[in-house]
């Protein structure tokens, strides 16, 4: 079943679905700065655009462009900067 989610006053929208192996969501972020929390480990894949990310325990920001991905540990917070509309796929667990 699909579930539509909206965060940060509509600046981030996603659709959750049951992926082939694990739960997932696909979404779009408007330009801005955001802080997300994780319950379980996540793999974030950038589909279009770019995400500049400060991962838990890291001191330096890293930029991931379309076709790239990064891992986020579970039970953590991470920060994201977005310069232009960016689409992503997030796989949980």
Curated annotation (Swiss-Prot):
Q: What does this protein do?
A: Catalyzes the phosphorolysis of diverse nucleosides, yielding D-ribose 1-phosphate and the respective free bases. Can use uridine, adenosine, guanosine, cytidine, thymidine, inosine and xanthosine as substrates. Also catalyzes the reverse reactions.
A Pfam match is: Ppnp
What Gene3D superfamilies has UniProt attached to this entry? Answer: Jelly Rolls (2.60.120.10)
A single GO CC term, please? cytosol
> Where do transmembrane segments lie in this chain?
none
Q: Give the enzyme's EC designation.
A: 2.4.2.1, 2.4.2.2
Which gene produces this protein? ppnP
Q: What keywords appear on the UniProt entry? A: Glycosyltransferase, Transferase
Which Gene Ontology molecular function entries are recorded, alphabetically?
Answer: guanosine phosphorylase activity; purine-nucleoside phosphorylase activity; thymidine phosphorylase activity; uridine phosphorylase activity
Q: What is this protein called?
A: Pyrimidine/purine nucleoside phosphorylase
Reaction equations catalysed: a purine D-ribonucleoside + phosphate = a purine nucleobase + alpha-D-ribose 1-phosphate; adenosine + phosphate = alpha-D-ribose 1-phosphate + adenine; cytidine + phosphate = cytosine + alpha-D-ribose 1-phosphate; guanosine + phosphate = alpha-D-ribose 1-phosphate + guanine
Top-level enzyme category: transferase
Query: Per the similarity annotation, which family is this?
Result: Belongs to the nucleoside phosphorylase PpnP family.
